[in-house]
Regions:
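Phosphoinositide system proteins, centered on phosphoinositide phosphatases
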Residues: 1-385, 414-545
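A phosphate-binding catalytic loop at a beta-strand-loop-alpha-helix junction
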Residues: 390-409
């Protein structure tokens, strides 16, 4: 569904108001009162109304408004870069944001409120620095191509030709909480409400008998968002940690568009892991008798959005993951009394041990009938020629490394079928084209790294296989370094990251509390030296032992 949002704007700052004047509608302005937070739209605006020498800047969009202890803040996109074009609409990646106080004199210097306000602002800034926020003025990134098209048909049947905020998929809308003040104003602010996703977007060009654009869009869920050991499993409503919808998008010329959607998410049971300075903390499974309830609600939600659901679990059947593998299998068997839900368990580490990565084809052949029956979505001359009526849901223990390997292999098979349909079977095997094969593998590996940094604090493991098709000694060494980096991040910094995410999403409001004051705001790159030192010490110990 096409959006009709305002583009970049001038932001004028007077002592009493913010004025946001769209570059594409210079006679209009959104006005925010800095004292009362009242929001209005002036349709006959002129800069002449403003004081001379008024402070101004150009912004790319509004993320929203956030209330903290001592004041209110306007959050805007101050810099972004073009990623590419999807469905003829530009897609942007956020590069820099600004948090602007409504009241410059919001607290007394040196007061306790000052300390907490500074801490909470640092938390917000740490989330906004996550290098994977995306938006578009013209295309709704919260929805897949299929959902967008279905909404377009529905709206046009009612004489509506642009979607409003009510069609955004709030599961993936990361600034929903920050847009509450705008929603209270009704439709007058619709064109200023920029849907803002966290995840990964990459757009590439290719050619094999025909020119095409190929994209990956990953949308991270908001309902149980968080960090690796702080956000595990499901809640009683069926929301799961690390829930991500990944869409592979294909455009051939002006007439053919296709997409295929997969999802990943934590094992949908009540379980968790508490950090205890071990590399692999013990898995605590809630003994609650109602373990099937969150699983049932999770499946109901998936069926509502996607249709048929097939579960693929890649965790170990023995050892550290053995008990939860058993519980998962038992509950999936019990849930069959409510739904017919295919469940495939593939012990990734056992089956692919000793570099036997070709054994992944065993899993792919097993689920191939479901991939084919679920289908993919395709449009030819704006007419539906295929629909996707189901979803493959993959997970490992983190739903990161093993999951991404399998998702990329499923995506490869689907893309072959889509290209074949687009070119009436004349294109041949797209993956015989070495340039595109390289692009495909590396883009899926980049997707893995982005999602892993968001959840675990480091790039993904096993991406050497995704990038090259085989395991390498270099890849094994990098996995060791990233594993140790995860250890440092998860044990020493993730509580702060979790609090920051919860504050950003509105899961708790800023107020003084016994939270520790963070020593510093850290990034992935600052953890690498610590991990290298640990890795060197472990290697020396093993060598000298």
């Amino acid at each position: 569904m096409d959006l009709n949002l305002h583009l970049a704007s001038y932001l004028y700052l007077t002592p009493s108001k913010f004025y946001i004047q769209p570059l594409d509608a210079p006679k209009e302005a959104l006005i925010i009162d800095r004292q009362t937070c009242e929001i209005t739209v002036n349709k006959i605006f002129s800069k002449d109304y403003l004081p001379k020498n008024v402070a101004s800047r150009i912004i790319d969009g509004i993320i929203g408004i956030k209330r903290l202890i001592s004041g209110v803040y306007l959050i805007v996109i101050s810099q972004s870069k073009l990623v590419g074009v999807i469905n003829e609409k530009p897609i942007y990646k956020v590069e820099q944001t600004s948090i602007i106080p409504f009241n410059e004199n919001r607290y007394e210097p040196g007061s306790g409120q000052n300390q907490w306000e500074t801490t909470y602002l640092a938390m917000l800034e740490s989330v906004l620095r996550t290098p994977s926020f995306y938006y578009s003025y013209g295309y709704d990134l919260t929805n897949s191509l299929q959902r967008n098209f279905e909404q377009t048909v529905e709206c046009q049947s009612r004489g509506v030709y642009y979607v409003g905020h009510q069609y955004y998929d709030r599961r993936f809308l990361w600034n929903q909480h920050l847009m509450i003040d705008f929603e209270r104003c009704g439709s007058i602010t619709d064109r200023y409400r920029l849907p803002f996703i966290l995840g990964f977007v990459c757009i590439k060009e290719g050619s094999i008998g025909l020119n095409f654009n190929w994209s990956i869009i990953s949308r991270r869920g908001t309902r149980r968002a968080g960090t690796r050991f702080n956000s595990r499993g499901a809640d009683f409503e069926g929301n799961v940690a690390n829930f991500v919808e990944t869409e592979q998008f294909l455009e051939c010329g002006e007439n053919f568009k296709a997409s295929h959607v997969q999802i990943r998410g934590s094992i949908p049971l009540l379980w968790g892991q508490k950090v205890n300075y071990r590399m692999k903390p013990p898995i605590d499974i809630n003994p609650h008798d109602e373990q099937c309830l969150p699983l049932k609600r999770h499946i109901e939600e998936l069926k509502k959005f996607y249709g048929d659901v097939s579960f693929v679990s890649l965790i170990d059947q023995r050892g550290h993951e053995g008990q939860i593998a058993y519980e998962y299998s038992q509950k999936m068997n019990r849930i069959q009394q409510y739904f017919i839900v295919p469940y495939h368990h593939f012990d990734f580490h056992k089956e692919c041990s000793k570099m036997r990565w070709h054994r992944l084809n065993i899993l792919l052949e097993k689920i191939q009938p479901e991939i084919e029956s679920q289908g993919y979505f395709a449009l030819l001359n704006n007419q539906v020629v295929n629909s996707q009526n189901g979803i493959i849901r993959s997970n490992c223990i983190d739903s990161l490394d093993r999951t991404n390997v399998v998702q990329s292999m499923i995506a490869k098979r689907v893309l072959e079928a889509q290209i074949d349909l687009a070119n009436n079977g004349l294109s041949g095997n797209i993956f015989l084209n070495e340039n595109f094969l390289y692009t495909f593998k590396n883009t899926w590996a980049d997707n893995a790294d982005a999602l892993s940094i968001q959840y675990a604090g480091t790039p993904a493991l096993k991406t050497d296989f995704t990038r090259t098709g085989q395991r390498t000694h270099y890849g094994v060494i990098m996995d060791g370094i990233n594993s140790l980096t995860r250890y440092v991040a998860n044990n020493f910094f993730d509580d702060y990251r979790q609090d920051a995410i919860d504050l950003f999403l509105g899961n708790f409001e800023g107020h003084p509390s016994p939270l520790y004051k963070p020593l510093s705001i850290i990034s992935y790159t600052s953890l690498v030296p610590a991990a290298l030192i640990l890795f060197t010490l472990v290697a020396l110990y093993l060598y000298l032992r």
